[in-house]
Amino acid sequence: MGTIHLFRKPQRSFFGKLLQEFRLVAADRRSWKILLFGAINVLCTGFLLMWCSSTNSIALTAYTYLTIFDLFSLITCLISYWVMMRKPSPVYSFGFERLEVLAVFASTVLAQLGALFILKESAERFLEQPEIHTGRLLVGTFVALSFNLFTMLSIRNKPFAYVSEAASTSWLQEHVADLSRSLCGLIPGLSSIFLPRMNPFVLIDLAGAFALCITYMLIEINNYFAVDTASAIAIALMTFGTMYPMSVYSGKVLLQTTPPHVIGQLDKLIREVSTLDGVLEVRNEHFWTLGFGSLAGSVHVRIRRDANEQMVLAHVSNRLCTLVSTLTVQIFKDDWIRPALSSGPVAPNVLNFSDHHVIPMPLLKNVDERTPVTSTPAKPSSPPPEFSFNTPGKNVSPVILLNTQTRPYSLGLNRGHTPYSSVFSQGLAFPGVGAGQGLRPTFPHIPSRYGINRMGQPRP
């Protein structure tokens, strides 16, 4: 028998949790207007679908899909209000802003799928064109146009407003902009109305209604039923062309990419951070788009051992917070320690190598195989990149001395420094050995025996 829990907390189902969150959003006064428009949208969509069936017009069906898209935009607006109410949780430490992006991406993709469905149905109608009844065609056009414009202009939809401005222009906007420039050249007073970038949703609503009006007139005058199919194809292409740039932009945000227009600003800020007092190196910087208009990022900063961590952290955060809203900065102190070398004479028993005093040569990587550790150059006073961030000897294997005694630091040799470029041509150089002398397996400049022998007498 299993353990009996008398006071077990009841587990809510998925729909129970969804209903609880919906009640949380519905309690806000700002969402009442959206819920009212959503109810009217469902009612209008039902009437439009019935009129599409009675008129047998596929062009009106394609235009009705824009009303369904308005319903998705209202749902996205509700999700935006819900995101503002919720705080980050341990599971979702960055918050729920990405749900807005996901809602916009799903809405635009569904609109494009509806446009593809209209194109498929229109291709079938070209083979056998049915008769179109114009009784409710014009009425349905004006009902759908009025509701779409009223919804777009009355509800402040923050996610779609941002995407429509940030995404690239559609081909419909470009053609209308060209016509507007030509018209404003003739009538300059219209420049304040037509020259600014038009709202793509309002533009497609007006263009679709214009196509349906032409369809109604041609069918009433000449019984030219094929124009209904042509109008449906035109509305579907305009819908696809309008939604495609928005879906591409929101998809890039979901893929956690960096917007191209802020890459130059981020590079400038990184260079400014690398010149701050106490900062030796900036590495592993990574920035991505968290939501619409918000960036997140992380960066590793290596500082001097005598630098104040809190002061450097405050300066770095102050520089980057102008662009990056959610920033993680990790501070590392410099771990490069040079041994203190004395300039006195060498003691007679400083080193006691074995009889053969063989030092195995370390394995060195080729210059081509080395990869840069950081994207920002280190300062001249900083240590080499092999000793960065507690990874000493990343590219060079350590040298093992085959004697049992501990090597003292007071060698009494002249302190020199061999640049990294000479390591591959002259052999490995150690700190404390002259700059022009490296250690090789044969040791041509070192006597074969030195120190004291086993009897305590100096060796020759």
Swiss-Prot record:
High-level lineage: Eukaryota, Metazoa, Chordata, Craniata, Vertebrata
Extracellular side: 55-64, 120-134, 222-223
UniProt function note: Has probably no intrinsic transporter activity but together with SLC30A5 forms a functional zinc ion:proton antiporter heterodimer, mediating zinc entry into the lumen of organelles along the secretory pathway. As part of that zinc ion:proton antiporter, contributes to zinc ion homeostasis within the early secretory pathway and regulates the activation and folding of enzymes like alkaline phosphatases and enzymes involved in phosphatidylinositol glycan anchor biosynthesis.
Protein name from the UniProt record: Zinc transporter 6
Family: Belongs to the cation diffusion facilitator (CDF) transporter (TC 2.A.4) family. SLC30A subfamily.
Presence of keyword Transmembrane: yes
GO biological process, one term: zinc ion import into Golgi lumen
Membrane topology: Multi-pass membrane protein
Organism: Mus musculus (Mouse)
Sequence intervals crossing the membrane: 34-54, 65-85, 99-119, 135-155, 201-221, 224-244
